[in-house]
Amino acid sequence: MAAKEVKFASDARDRMLRGVDTLANAVKVTLGPKGRNVVIEKSFGAPRITKDGVTVAKEIELKDKFENMGAQMLREVASKQNDKAGDGTTTATVLAQAIVREGAKAVAAGMNPIDLKRGIDLAVGTVVKDLESHAKKVSANSEIAQVATISANGDETVGRFLAEAMDKVGNEGVITVEEAKSLETELETVEGMQFDRGYLSPYFVTNTEKLKVELEDPYILIHEKKLSNLQALIPLLEQVVQSGKPLLIIAEDVEGEALATLVVNKLRGGLKVAAVKAPGFGDRRKAMLEDVAILTAGNVVSEELGTKLENVTIGMLGRAKKVIIDKDNTTIVDGAGNKADIDARVSQIRAQIETTTSDYDREKLQERVAKLAGGVAVIRVGGATEVEVKERKDRVDDALHATRAAVEEGILPGGGIALLRALKSLDGLKAANDDQQSGIDIVRRALRAPARQIAENAGEDGAYIVGKLLEGDDYNHGFNAATGEYEDLVKSGVIDPAKVVRTALQDAASVASLLITTEALVAELPKEDTPAPMPAMDF
């Protein structure tokens, strides 16, 4: 086991505080509409230019191991905030730095760190209640666009696209962000359920211009196993032909004689038919086929469930208004499923999302919810250079998360003003002792930090602006750093999602409390490089 170096008490906290300051000072310059850029060196390719706080935080690694511990704990604030709300990482970092600085001073002055932590927790709980009581629900398309525009650092095109995407696929829908191959940013939406399996044979194509299979009002056969011959299906196929409706077959695979028979029937015009492979693999495939069955009011034909192909009747097939298949994807539009059944299935998948520990599983489950409950939208981000595209993609990702958060918990005035206005809620707060009261005062001072930093990044005197704002009583009245005006921030579109502000404060206080109550640091000593022994000399 390698030898360790141990630091105690104020020496430990001072080292960590240096690391916290290094990381926070690099991150906080990006805060606000007039935030500065940070240029990050890459081991290959062009350097990366960003205004995204979490991207900067993730790149910082310090040489001194003890300082690095402080920086890494602060990086944890940014990462947590990014995972929970997708935005507000810089605000969380600024708040954490302010709480740690004040807390370290208080501990150095002889106060009890545990009581300080209790005071901080008490104050944060009170502020969170105040924020929740002032949050305004978001529903209008224009308000959603405003939130998205702010999170994308004032890019109105992104705001408009995101509002449009959420309008089309709903809050549950999947919105993915990709890099475009062109200069323009564009939005593509898919209504209904789409899965990444194309037609099994180009002979199924009905629209030769677009090379797509388009089936109007088809029956849908959902089969779990491979189909290699159609003998068992002949009675069912005859019923489908008599109904005059097309047929879509979804199975693990359709091969050999079965595929040849279907193609021949399609070409002769006897049966309008198409076949695709089932989506997913293993247990996920079974679950996705069940999703398709519920969406289309059909049954999965599976021997595990006791149904055999020869016993399938036309009533066991799914129905949909339209099915569109290209060489890569199948889209089922407007399935005939019962809304109550679909809602029950969505609730069931949501329960699985709550309990799963795997990020990959969670992502796949969320996609399934979206396909059942909403739709899928893809925003393709364009730009003149690779660096520009990457930077814009970061901003669109931020804006997407922030917009979702706004719809979830409502909005507050932006520019750090909601935290400033929350100072009033701490006025009547009484602590059990003086040290806890100091904890409350630490939060009181920290709440001013984001508004001050936004003003300073815009080239203004932060302390003066915060003082001026605290003179007024109007909750929404604040300093618009983009224009340099004092105005009603909600009316002028400077808004923050309540969830972003709330989680920023909670995560910052959580990590800052850990740093304040740290009494010892342990790190490995660097290994001494022993020179290699000289080879023996042969005389």
From Swiss-Prot:
GO CC field: cytoplasm
Main location: cytoplasm
Alphabetical list of InterPro entries matching this protein: Chaperonin_Cpn60_CS (IPR018370), Cpn60/GroEL (IPR001844), Cpn60/GroEL/TCP-1 (IPR002423), GroEL-like_apical_dom_sf (IPR027409), GROEL-like_equatorial_sf (IPR027413), TCP-1-like_intermed_sf (IPR027410)
PROSITE patterns, per the entry: CHAPERONINS_CPN60
Keywords (A to Z) from UniProt: ATP-binding, Chaperone, Cytoplasm, Isomerase, Nucleotide-binding
Localization of this protein: Cytoplasm
Binding residues for ATP: 30-33, 51, 87-91, 415, 480-482, 496
GO molecular function, one term: isomerase activity
BP terms from Gene Ontology: protein refolding
Reaction(s) catalysed (UniProt annotation): ATP + H2O + a folded polypeptide = ADP + phosphate + an unfolded polypeptide
EC number: 5.6.1.7
Superkingdom of origin organism: Bacteria
Gene3D superfamilies registered for this protein in UniProt: GroEL (3.50.7.10), GroEL-like equatorial domain (1.10.560.10), TCP-1-like chaperonin intermediate domain (3.30.260.10)
NCBIfam families: GroEL (TIGR02348), PRK00013.1 (NF000592), PRK12849.1 (NF009487), PRK12850.1 (NF009488), PRK12851.1 (NF009489)
Function: Together with its co-chaperonin GroES, plays an essential role in assisting protein folding. The GroEL-GroES system forms a nano-cage that allows encapsulation of the non-native substrate proteins and provides a physical environment optimized to promote and accelerate protein folding.
Subunit structure: Forms a cylinder of 14 subunits composed of two heptameric rings stacked back-to-back. Interacts with the co-chaperonin GroES.
Family note: Belongs to the chaperonin (HSP60) family.
Listed name of the protein: Chaperonin GroEL 1
